[in-house]
Amino acid sequence: MKIAVIGYSASGKSTLAARLGEMTGCPVLFLDKVQFLPGWQERDRAEARGMVEDFLNENRERGWVIDGNYANFHQERRMAEADLIFFMDFPRRICLPQALYRNWKYKGRARESIAEGCDEKMDLEFLLWILRDGRSRERRQQFRDLMERHPRKVVVLKRRRDVRHCLELLDRIAAENQNRDRTGKITGNEELR
């Protein structure tokens, strides 16, 4: 199974992606780990694109879970190849407290979904990204366009309850279909659509 997890910052994309990786047995790629080098330095774009392309090619048959938006990192290919696209469409009133909690939890160290040496931080730029810039009219339109191009694959999650329900459904499907085919795909995912 190939799953893309996209959405707003601090909506829980990385947490969901990690859980989906555990459930499916597929490798997980956190695009923040691709984007950043230690000390929050940005990786060369060509190198980053190459890393994503290599991951997609190496896991073509096995399947994958990819966490993150990053339009420049083969986004259209990722969406086209994905069996499912989870869009974390959480409101600011949920994302901001989650970002503050994450900052407290990982203060002074890197979380699992970011490069080593990128210690968790909360600054004005990131707060503005969560509250305003990351939800600009242009960004919202990009998400709408993506959903219009792949309507049968997108599952919109607007609150934690949606995520729990989705994971419970995937658990049930996996339990009913313990025999995975040779590509690692969970069969029966048509219930999600």
Predicted regions and their residues:
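Walker A (P-loop) ATP-phosphate-binding motif of ABC ATPase nucleotide-binding domains
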Residues: 2
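Hydrophobic anchor at the beta1->P-loop junction of P-loop NTPases
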Residues: 5
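The conserved Walker
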Residues: 9
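Conserved lysine of the Walker
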Residues: 13
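Conserved substrate/cofactor phosphate-moiety recognition/catalytic segment
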Residues: 18, 22-62
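NTP-dependent small-molecule kinase module
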Residues: 23, 131-193
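Glycine-rich phosphate-binding loop used to anchor ATP phosphates in small-molecule kinases
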Residues: 51-96
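A glycine- and Lys/Arg-enriched "phosphate-lid" helix/loop adjacent to the NTP-binding pocket
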Residues: 90-138
